[in-house]
């Protein structure tokens, strides 16, 4: 295992997975999502101290800051990247060095938003694993979400890398 994600699951499972990733030296994304209310501020701060990346939406970002008592800057200085999705407004990636405003990818039609966040994170993981720059990683995540929203259900979209790359080039003006 070279990369992981701790996403909404049972409370004990999330705590255990984060501890095991950290102990094994495996970089991982902490994605608290709808499980955030299961944890107190101290536990959320501990997750942030263990992880390399935090990903949340706008609402979750505010809640995470409120529950931890940490500002966005406090979180950013503890991780490689603090990633916030902003729905139709794209996303932001905050690193200790710089904040990247990532433009949205435009879908052809909106069919079902269920699973868009998961698709976004799949793009992030792929981009991080392949060593792309943050602007490209964010664009990959945004495009994955846009492609997902065009299809019903959570896993009914299918495309290969060449098709994805063509969409990426059309959306952002350069190929991967």
Label each residue range with its predicted role.
Residues 1-101, 132, 163, 169-176:
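Ribokinase/PfkB-type carbohydrate-kinase core domain
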Residues 78-81, 105-175:
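Conserved post-catalytic alpha-helical subdomain immediately downstream of the catalytic base
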């Amino acid at each position: 295992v070279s990369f992981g994600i701790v996403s909404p699951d049972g409370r004990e499972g999330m705590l255990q997975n984060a501890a095991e990733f950290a102990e094994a030296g495996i970089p991982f994304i902490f994605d608290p999502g709808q499980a955030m209310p299961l944890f107190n501020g101290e536990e959320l701060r501990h997750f942030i101290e263990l992880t390399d990346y935090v990903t949340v939406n706008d609402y979750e970002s505010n809640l995470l800051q409120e529950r931890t008592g940490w500002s966005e800057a406090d979180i950013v200085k503890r991780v490689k990247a603090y990633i916030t999705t902003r729905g139709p407004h794209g996303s932001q990636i905050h690193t200790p060095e710089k904040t990247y405003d990532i433009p949205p990818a435009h879908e052809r039609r909106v069919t079902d938003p269920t699973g868009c966040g998961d698709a976004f994170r799949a793009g992030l993981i792929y981009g991080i694993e392949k060593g792309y720059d943050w602007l490209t990683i964010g664009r990959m995540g945004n495009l994955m979400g846009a492609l997902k929203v065009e299809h019903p259900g959570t896993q009914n979209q299918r495309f290969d890398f060449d098709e994805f790359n063509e969409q990426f080039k059309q959306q952002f003006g350069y190929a991967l």
